[in-house]
Every structure is written in C-alpha cells, then in structure tokens.
Amino acid sequence: MKTTEMTTAMFKDRVMDLEKMSDKWEFKGDKPAIIDFYATWCGPCKMIAPIVEEIANDYDGKIDVYKVDVDKNEELAAMFGIQTIPTLLFIPMEGKPVTSVGAKMMPELEEMIKQHLLK
C-alpha cells in the first residue's frame, strides 16, 4: 500500500471529527495509523519520505499511513500543534496519539510502531 495524501475532510471521515473533538480522543479508524505531517520544501521531510513509504508497504493491512501537507492543511497542523516538520503522529486503536518530531531512521520508527501501535 502506498501512503495516502490526507485532507481535512478525509481526516474527519477516517480519523476524528474535528467539530466533535473533546478532551477524549475517539479514533474512527479500523486499524492503527501513522500521519506524516510534512511540507514539499522541507529537506528532512524529503529524507524520511522513502522510509514512510517503506513502512506503508511493510505494514500493509496492519497500519494505515497518511501524509498531510501542512501548507495545504493548516487546520490539521494547528489542531495538533505541529510547529516542526517532519512530525509523525502514531495513532493507536485505543489511547491518545503519540508524536515523533524530526527525521528518524527506520529502526527508531519500527520501535515506535511496536511500542505504540502493534502491542
């Protein structure tokens, strides 16, 4: 599976309805997810893009992997307080999402997947 470019509308449908957001996180997905917040002009984002694609392929059917262009989806970036990119949001089936800020290599990301998504 390739990564899917996510819009605000898709986020509301597949992850969480922003209008109904409260103190409690209510994930709509049917499997854990990773959201890569990036920008097309960001060097570190370009560096991890192939790694994120590899994760999407390696974990196909187990984890949904999305990409959010922060310049096109400012509302989503603001909602999660994204100020540094790349930022990866790891969304488990239960519990709150966990963020990873900055470019990380595959072993580090796989550890986060095991620790937070595929327990």
At which residue positions do the language-model features occur?
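Structural microenvironment flanking redox-active thiols in thiol-disulfide oxidoreductases
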Residues: 68-78
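Structural signal for short hydrophobic segments within the conserved structured cores
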Residues: 4, 64-66, 98-101
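Hydrophobic beta-strand anchors of alpha/beta hydrolase catalytic cores
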Residues: 34-35, 65, 88
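Short pre-active-site segment immediately N-terminal to redox-active cysteine/selenocysteine motifs
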Residues: 30-33, 37-41, 84
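Non-catalytic, surface beta->alpha helical segment in thiol-disulfide oxidoreductase systems
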Residues: 84, 89-119
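Conserved redox-active cysteine motifs that mediate thiol-disulfide chemistry
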Residues: 37-51
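Conserved helix-turn-beta segment immediately C-terminal to the redox Cys motif
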Residues: 30-31, 49-68
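A short beta-strand-turn-helix
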Residues: 6-33
